[in-house]
Structure formats: structure tokens, C-alpha cells
């Protein structure tokens, strides 16, 4: 199956008409992954037997008109638990962890007839911006195999961009869906915090994590979000609010819409060539009848330090459960119980995870709590208020997803602060709990540029409306990555 020339709607029609069966589609997809992934390294594990069994069941039951995902193979980021399929979070400490239940999003996909074909690579415990922190392999950018795919959902993004699957799930804590989507020239959507259940998502930072989508087409993302969104009694952070049809506003014009462009998002540190692509996108929106006005989000500069204190502090707490006792990796030849804890965690966690655990533990300690964690929370409030002030007068905020295009593998891995700053434009959205998407906005030196669209709380529909209008005006998807 040529996923470069196919949307979920087109795939649904082929499956409904009998032009292709789900079993054939799964076989073709698995064969394509086995061929392409030798270079891309997007997958950690394939669910071949489970996918074939599910496909046969879908073929036997038939596909209804209102089941656009039925029979469609989808990849899953490896921090979303899947019953019977090893789930590692790309960490040695969970190398052989076989979950006994499915995450809520997996249950919803299964009920919709979608097929999990495999688990994708990521930065260990979703901590990273390049997928170089995986304990198992380094995923390559679909456009240039010497460059990173972004992170932490780099495997999911590369798999979609390389044409291995039509769609994938990822998670976004500080940009982990949008940044790899931008680096690989695809659509990445982070829903509003609380829109999608986190039950079954291996926790990194509980107040920031959110499951979202990676696809080539805007409507595909909306259809996927239609299935996975909604309140879940097992996750108290999910919002008990109605879930609209996210495809409803796709195709509507954007005439009269008021769009904000923060001056901080085109300032120091942003590649001028990337900034030019965003300015060109703003001009396109104006040509479509919208107004684009420069605004200010003055506390953007404090987002990265605030985020790394909050996220690391929550990670320090969340990762206490990985102790070598209940499940996961356990060190051998230990002398006593303390040795089990110390050696299992020392040998099981990678350097970036240990760095963040130590930072978080320090920030939460009695002598530094007020100076660091409490202060970071206050900055988070200021960043949220910045967005609230802008959204009093505007429908949407736009800007670059990342300051630069994808960087070379190994280029930033020894300089964590430089790596962290790559997420400066995506992190504020997570701190404020807002929905946002990255859509293709052109190329710089042959590498994709992402346009970030930020919406009001629980207004993903406007993001999809504007993203689809922008997509329809451009032919960026006509260019296909070939790797190098």
C-alpha cells in the first residue's frame, strides 16, 4: 500500500468496496515496514500475529460507513501499554515488560476496528528531543538519515513520514509530538490536556503528558482524535466535556478569523529561513481573508527552565515505582535489598533519565522547594495568563514549531541545555494545557519546516479548520522523503 498517496478516507473506501481486505492491508504494511525500517529504525517491535488476527476479525465482521479506522493499521508509541505486546518506554528497565491490560486509547482504537501493527521507538521515558536517548536504537529522520527525527515521539513520526504506516499515536509532554512532526514534514496534534485519557500511558510528567496523533493529512488526525478523545473514569484528569466531531469544520473558510503571531516566536534563536516560512504562511492566511497581528507572550523566555523543574520533579516521583522488585529489570548478583534498588535503577535507567530524576529530587528537597518548584509553578501561571490575554481578542496563535530544521545525529547529545532549548516554542503550550498542532510549512535546505497552530482550551476544531485550509493551499505532501 502506497501510504504517500492515500488518506484514511480513501483507505476506508477501498476496504468498504472490497478492493483490498484488511488482512491484505496488514500483510502489505508489515512487508513495507520490514523493508523500510532497516534504514529508518522507527519500530521497536512488531505485533504481526496480533495484527493479522485482528484483521481477519475485521474482514469477517465487515466495515460500517461510520467506522473510518476499521481495518486500518496504526503504529503505537512504546510508552502506551498494549496487552500481550512488550512495552518498554525505550528503557532497559522495562526491556521485558509485557502488560496485562490495554491503555484506554488502545481499547478505543480496538473498538473502532483499528489495528496495532507495532510499537515505535522513542526517547527513554519520553525524555528527549531527538530519540537518541532510546536504550535500543537510534531512529533516523525520514528525509535525511544523518539527521534526528525529533523526539520523544521520533519513531512514530518517522514511521508515518517514511510511508510505513498511515497514522500513529504519540505523547506530548513538552513538544514530543509537534517537534518530530515538524522535523519529518507531517501533521502532529497535541490535544488539550484532559481531552484524551492518560490511563495506560507510562507517566513522565503527569500534569503535562498528553496522548495525540501523527498523520500525513489534517483530516486523518481529526478522525483519529474522534476515536481516542473523551472522558475516562479511570483517569481523573480527563475532562467530562462533550467531544465534538473534529472533522466538522474542515473545509470551512477562515475569512474573518483573527490570528495572532507572537513576536517572541520569531526572535533570537529562530533560524531566519524558518522565520521566513512562517511569515509566508501568515501572508497566506491573510490572502484567505484572516487577519494576522503581532502580539506578545512576554514570559516565553522563562518556559524552558520552568518546564524542566516541573517535569523533572514529577518524573522523580513517577519513576520511583521502577525499583527492580515489582516488575521490569532487576540487577543480578545483588547483596541486599538496598543493592537491588541502587543497582537496578543505576543499570536500568539511561543517563538522561537519571539526570532528570536527580534534578527533580533536588528541586523537591526541603531546602530548595520554594526557590525552584514553587517558583516554577508561579511562572507556569504567568505563561498561562499570557495565552489567556491573547485569546481574549484572537481565535488562534501561530508560529514556528521549532527554531531550526532537524539537526544532525550526535550534534547536541553532549549538550543537554542546547538540546532542551529546541523545545522553547512548544513547551509553553504544555504548561498552559492548550491544544496545538504542527503542519508542514515548506522546506529549508531540503528539510521540512513546521507551522505551529495553538488554540483555545478544548477548541481543537478551530485548529483543524485552519490547518486544513492551509493544507489545501499548498502541495508540501506532494514531496516524498527519500532519506540519504
Curated annotation (Swiss-Prot):
<feature type="active site" description="Charge relay system">
    <location>
        <position position="152"/>
    </location>
</feature>
<comment type="similarity">
    <text>Belongs to the amidase family. GatA subfamily.</text>
</comment>
<dbReference type="InterPro" id="IPR020556">
    <property type="entry name" value="Amidase_CS"/>
</dbReference>
<dbReference type="InterPro" id="IPR023631">
    <property type="entry name" value="Amidase_dom"/>
</dbReference>
<dbReference type="GO" id="GO:0006412">
    <property type="term" value="P:translation"/>
</dbReference>
<protein>
    <recommendedName>
        <fullName>Glutamyl-tRNA(Gln) amidotransferase subunit A</fullName>
        <ecNumber>6.3.5.7</ecNumber>
    </recommendedName>
</protein>
<dbReference type="InterPro" id="IPR000120">
    <property type="entry name" value="Amidase"/>
</dbReference>
<comment type="subunit">
    <text>Heterotrimer of A, B and C subunits.</text>
</comment>
<dbReference type="InterPro" id="IPR004412">
    <property type="entry name" value="GatA"/>
</dbReference>
<keyword id="KW-0648">Protein biosynthesis</keyword>
<dbReference type="GO" id="GO:0005524">
    <property type="term" value="F:ATP binding"/>
</dbReference>
<keyword id="KW-0067">ATP-binding</keyword>
<comment type="function">
    <text>Allows the formation of correctly charged Gln-tRNA(Gln) through the transamidation of misacylated Glu-tRNA(Gln) in organisms which lack glutaminyl-tRNA synthetase. The reaction takes place in the presence of glutamine and ATP through an activated gamma-phospho-Glu-tRNA(Gln).</text>
</comment>
<feature type="active site" description="Charge relay system">
    <location>
        <position position="77"/>
    </location>
</feature>
<feature type="active site" description="Acyl-ester intermediate">
    <location>
        <position position="176"/>
    </location>
</feature>
<keyword id="KW-0436">Ligase</keyword>
<dbReference type="Pfam" id="PF01425">
    <property type="entry name" value="Amidase"/>
</dbReference>
<keyword id="KW-0547">Nucleotide-binding</keyword>
<dbReference type="GO" id="GO:0030956">
    <property type="term" value="C:glutamyl-tRNA(Gln) amidotransferase complex"/>
</dbReference>
<dbReference type="InterPro" id="IPR036928">
    <property type="entry name" value="AS_sf"/>
</dbReference>
<dbReference type="GO" id="GO:0050567">
    <property type="term" value="F:glutaminyl-tRNA synthase (glutamine-hydrolyzing) activity"/>
</dbReference>
